[in-house]
């Protein structure tokens, strides 16, 4: 999320009295861009994420021809200038997702469970 959604989320949390936890996913932007590219070019990704106009049943065999693929410059601009790295509401848990194998999942689950039990 970014600051654009913060007030809406905060108001919903207050209205429905729920506890907010922000998971901020950080990482090497070069690695994250390559991961994003791979995901976008995967035929299993729904085409509507990649094109400016989509109608049910549309097919695009060569995903690299999609007109809304996120370029390197757009990706970097979004990551650096939309406030994703500073968004925080409630308790913050920051996770480096550069290498999934290095994430201590049990520790994350414990931290979240401990918060819920408070």
What are these regions (language model features)?
Residues 5-6, 34, 105:
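Short glycine-/acidic-enriched loop or helix-start segments at secondary-structure transitions
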Residues 1, 26-32, 99-101:
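Conserved nucleotide-binding/hydrolysis micro-motifs of P-loop NTPases
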Residues 102, 106-109, 114-118:
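C-terminal alpha-helical "lid" subdomain
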Residues 42-106:
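Small-molecule kinase domains that catalyze NTP-dependent phosphoryl transfer to phosphate-bearing small molecules
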Residues 12-13, 115:
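Hydrophobic helix-cap positions at the C-terminus of alpha-helices
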Residues 1-11:
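Conserved nucleotide-sensing/catalytic segment adjacent to the nucleotide-binding pocket
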Residues 14-39:
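Conserved phosphate-donor/acceptor-positioning beta-strand/loop module used by diverse small-molecule
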Residues 35, 53, 78, 111, ...:
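Residues that form generic nucleotide/phosphate-binding pockets
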């Amino acid at each position: 999320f970014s600051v654009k959604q913060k007030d809406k989320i905060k108001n919903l949390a207050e209205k429905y009295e729920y506890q907010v936890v922000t998971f901020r996913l950080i990482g090497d932007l070069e690695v994250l861009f390559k991961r994003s590219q791979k995901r976008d070019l995967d035929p299993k990704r729904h085409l509507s994420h990649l094109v400016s106009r989509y109608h049910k049943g549309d097919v695009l065999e060569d995903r690299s021809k999609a007109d809304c693929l996120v370029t390197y410059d757009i990706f970097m601009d979004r990551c650096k200038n939309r406030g994703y790295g500073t968004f925080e509401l409630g308790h913050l848990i920051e996770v480096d997702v550069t290498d999934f194998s290095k994430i201590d999942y049990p520790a994350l689950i414990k931290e979240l469970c401990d918060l819920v039990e408070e």
